[in-house]
């Protein structure tokens, strides 16, 4: 990340704009992975929300009115997401990713259960590990699976039963093979 302080300030400003639309967000993606002891290179900060398409459109307008460059990528019928707003500025790239009408329960639960913040006094809450694993399983693909393996390997004291329960609750498949791979990594 080019300037972590600048992107955090921008994300905190964006949270204020989200609240004006009665939305809340949870930090997901690489910043959440880093907060949970798995640091990998990233150039952006991702916020997970539950916002329908009309709200995403209105939010894009509000972001522009606040001086941000914001572009909404609307979902098509096959898209696993409910839309993505790219927020661009001197701070870098923020992405507001909606799971509304696709996978809203994981965001709702993460918002309710998140206790970790990016820094003291910040409104930026970090997705809990079980829900981060669920989001990565939902995303699928090699990179997301590799992220899960590394996340689990770097957090050996995790309650794996809780992660299994969360993933089962959302009817996500594929966790067991990743748990096996992670335990192999921890044994090395």
Please place each PLM-identified region on the residue numbering.
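Compositionally biased terminal segments of proteins
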Residues: 1-188
